[in-house]
Amino acid sequence: MKKRVLPVCFILMAFVSGPGVWAQTTDASGDHTAPSYDMKAQSLVDLERVQKKFVDLANALPADKMTWRPSTDSRSFAELFLHVAGERYAILKLMGAAAPEGFDTRAFEKTTTDKAKIVDELNKSWEFSKKTIDGMTNADFAKLIPKLGPQANAGDVVYILVADAHEHLGQSIAYARVNGIVPPWTAEAQKKAAEKKPEQK
């Protein structure tokens, strides 16, 4: 699992048909099969779920595991979590969000190996992401960002953030499993399943 640099070529989705794409409503024909879809709300729900898993997993790690890495050319646990936090600033900056003063993507992930500080950085970057996306309307998702490509828009940037979060969550789970650490949400599900078994007999 080698270090990945923020992609310069994005897979851009077809979000260029105008605000009507983001807020579908039923028409006079009485077609009620296409309910409205709130892109902002859905992206925030998805990102918040992933954020909770990152924090829960970081808190579940023994402090001395923060410097563990699967190979010399891979990120450590600490670097991976800080990379996640840093990419929130870097990705949302693509659509004009202001990252913290003096923020440097590459340097940021090497700033600390302290577990409490890492969790704090995950929380701060999540609040930044939430505030940025909360400040958008669904129509804003369709706004073009020419510097990213002729059809690229703000919605693409948000979904790059969503995809990136899931990618690194999977990476962090693999790190944990290699070290014999069961993700807390999985452990909780297993516990509930075990408690139900006696009731089923």
Predicted regions and their residues:
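Acidic/histidine-rich, surface-exposed loop or edge segments in extracytoplasmic proteins
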Residues: S29-M39, A97-T111
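Acidic/histidine-rich alpha-helical segments that form the ligand environment
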Residues: K110-P146, N153-H168
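Alpha-helical packing segments of well-folded alpha/beta enzyme cores
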Residues: D46, V50-L57, E87, I118-T132, ...
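Short, contiguous alpha-helical
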Residues: L44-E48, V55, K65-R106, P146-K201
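Surface-exposed helix-capping loop/turn segments at secondary-structure junctions
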Residues: A60-T67, T132-A142, V178-P183
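Bacterial N-terminal signal peptides
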Residues: C9-G20
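Positively charged n-region of N-terminal signal peptides that target proteins for export
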Residues: M1-R4
